[in-house]
Curated annotation (Swiss-Prot):
Protein name per UniProt: Small, acid-soluble spore protein P
Compositional bias per record (Basic residues), positions renumbered to this chain: 30-48
Chief place where the protein resides: other
Gene from which this protein is expressed: sspP
UniProt KW RNA-binding keyword: no
């Protein structure tokens, strides 16, 4: 149980720091987060 958790954490951390654009799940999450951030910033500017 502990080994599996560590392995998963290490695996996620490895691709994140090594290739922040290679993993599909990470890339998708990052893309959506980035897009949301830009949209929110744009919206805020417009609201002001």
């Amino acid at each position: 149980m502990t080994n599996k958790n560590t392995s998963k954490d290490m695996h996620k951390n490895a691709p994140k720091g090594h290739n922040p654009g290679q993993p599909e799940p990470l890339s998708g999450s990052k893309k959506v987060k980035n897009r949301n951030h830009t949209r929110q910033k744009h919206n805020s500017s417009h609201d002001m």
